[in-house]
Amino acid sequence: MKRLGVNIDHVATVRNARGSFHPDPFTIAKHVIKCGAHSVTIHLREDRRHIKDSDVVKICKSRKIITNLEISLNKEIIDIALKNRPNFICIVPEKRKEVTTEGGLNLIKNKKKIKSIISLFNKKSIRTSLFIDPNLKDIKIAKELNATCVELHTGKISNLIKENKSYKNEYLKIKKCSELGVKLGIEVHAGHGLDYKTTSILSKIKEITEFNIGHFIIGESLTHGLKKTITIFKEITNK
């Protein structure tokens, strides 16, 4: 059974647009789980553009919500994650001017730092994932760093599919990375830019155990509601 994680960052984006308390990410997080999602993903960015520290505290504190907290390599953010003890953390690259995460981590450049961070989370029994581009070298490095999981960046294949361009090579990259990850004992997740069609295509890769989807689900739910949107994704991923 493949799992579905729902990123609710843009619930916070809507709230922050009016500087108010509504919609409340914590309330939506609980609703997402009731609607059938396995987990909730939130990204505490350094600039706090959507999710705030108080959101992290409330969501991580709830035992009814399996929380995947996305964080950068920033010490302040790492300390907040350690204090609040989510079920998972996913280390992602972060640039202040980007609209959304633009690519995977540079594991070679940040190897020593990432390994020490993973060690901190492992000691607290917090599972650690690395957000990486689909290449075999990074899968091998993730194993060296003692990461529990990797989340493969699916932005490129998503764009190719949406533009009706050939995506065969990118699909094979993701498939080979997924196979190697499982062979090395690493759990493989996928996320970024996913919609119904792209998720349907990638769900054929049996080694991928989890899809993390945010923007499309939040947007689609404005028309069809969270329950129906989440149900459709669960049906797609487990055909």
UniProtKB/Swiss-Prot annotation:
Keyword match Transferase: yes
GO biological process terms, semicolon-separated: pyridoxine biosynthetic process
Annotated site residues (Transition state stabilizer) in this chain: E151
Alphabetized CDD domains for the sequence: PNPsynthase (cd00003)
What residues bind 3-amino-2-oxopropyl phosphate, as annotated? N7, R18, G193, G214, H215
UniProt catalytic activity: 3-amino-2-oxopropyl phosphate + 1-deoxy-D-xylulose 5-phosphate = pyridoxine 5'-phosphate + phosphate + 2 H2O + H(+)
Pathway assigned to this chain's UniProt record: Cofactor biosynthesis; pyridoxine 5'-phosphate biosynthesis; pyridoxine 5'-phosphate from D-erythrose 4-phosphate: step 5/5
Which parts pass through the membrane?
none
**Which of UniProt's keywords are assigned here?**
Cytoplasm, Pyridoxine biosynthesis, Transferase
Q: Name one GO cellular component term.
A: cytosol
What's the protein here called? Pyridoxine 5'-phosphate synthase
- Species annotation: Pelagibacter ubique (strain HTCC1062)
Please name the taxonomic classification of the source: Bacteria, Pseudomonadati, Pseudomonadota, Alphaproteobacteria, Candidatus Pelagibacterales
Gene name, per UniProt, is: pdxJ
